[in-house]
Amino acid sequence: MDRERQKKAPIYEALEAFKKKRVVPFDVPGHKRGRGNPELVQLLGEKCVSLDVNSMKPLDNLCHPVSVIREAEELAAEAFGAASAYLMVGGTTSAVQSMILSVVKAGDKIILPRNVHKSVINALVLCGGIPIYVNPEMNQKLGISLGMQVEKVKQAIEDNPDAVAVFVKIGRASCRERV
């Protein structure tokens, strides 16, 4: 990983450069960089609202990134050691649903922990996928889920070789010896 390259913030840098051009906003968002809503400026701060602009060519487009968003995604992938990364809006729910809906079709099986977020279940309802549940281990003393054990996931894969995906949710602290 190129540590110097990782110091870049392409989207933020593009927003700052755009701000310096002093373009007059005639589109969304309606607060017009805070000029139309002093209460919003007070709540979020001038810095935040001054950079809140609509997507336009100099700032790239999330639907088809070709410049600063693409560069930010490449930097994220490099930082995570992944082949690719995608920036999302709409929170984790939209990211989870995008992942599942892009892979699982009606009648397809997906292996997942029994305690998944409702966004996973909603995605399965939308696509018609069939959940194959793996019960997570529990810390009885603390009453918290520890995640799925590798052996149980391997068994679920062996029992369901036609499954098209395995959905894994992991907290950083529970990565060791867990899926």
Task: Please give the residue ranges for each predicted region.
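N-terminal "arm"/small-domain region of PLP-dependent enzymes with the aminotransferase-like
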Residues: 1-67
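Conserved N-terminal alpha-helix of the aminotransferase class I/II PLP-enzyme fold
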Residues: 46-94
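Gly/Ser/Thr-rich loops at beta-strand to alpha-helix junctions
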Residues: 69, 90-95, 116-118, 171-174
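Conserved beta-loop-alpha segment that forms the PLP phosphate-binding cup at the N-terminus of a helix
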Residues: 84-108, 123
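Substrate-binding/gating loop at the entrance of the active-site cleft, primarily
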Residues: 112-131
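Short, acidic/turn-prone active-site loops that include or flank metal/cofactor-
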Residues: 115-118, 135-141
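Active-site phosphate-binding strand-loop segment of PLP-dependent enzymes
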Residues: 142-178
